């Protein structure tokens, strides 16, 4: 481990067990503040607006702009998907009505029947 993280000169042994058992506990003379002070980013993890507080102001503005871009992209993609869906449904309904219109108009005329009977 990192020698600055654990103070090897002040490690305590547990129940007389030597070796690596004390190394896992660390130095008990240091308080919680010392352990937390060694880690970077002592600020809270999130600000009140939901943006990660550990970011620099430039990174915060970049993060906000990325979130805004993602939101706009999602709205536009949903608009396109629903537009294609409703346009397709509308075209399907129109084509079905046109097919029904053509089917009703395709009936044999009386002249064709008379010509067929006249040949026999």
UniProtKB/Swiss-Prot annotation:
InterPro entries linked to this entry: Reprimo_fam (IPR043383)
Chain's gene name: RPRML
Compartments it resides in: Membrane
Keyword field: Membrane, Phosphoprotein, Transmembrane, Transmembrane helix
Domain of life: Eukaryota
Protein name: Reprimo-like protein
Membrane topology: Single-pass membrane protein
Primary location class: membrane
């Amino acid at each position: 481990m990192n020698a600055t993280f654990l103070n090897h000169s002040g490690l305590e042994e547990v129940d007389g067990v030597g070796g690596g058992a004390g190394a896992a506990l660390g130095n008990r003379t240091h308080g919680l503040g010392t352990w937390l002070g060694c880690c970077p980013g002592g600020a809270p993890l999130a600000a009140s607006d939901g943006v990660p507080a550990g970011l620099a102001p430039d990174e915060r503005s970049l993060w906000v702009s990325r979130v805004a871009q993602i939101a706009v992209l999602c709205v536009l993609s949903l608009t396109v998907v629903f537009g294609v869906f409703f346009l397709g449904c509308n075209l399907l309904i129109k084509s079905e009505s046109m097919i029904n219109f053509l089917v009703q108009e395709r009936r044999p005329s009386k002249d064709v029947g008379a010509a067929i009977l006249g040949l026999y």
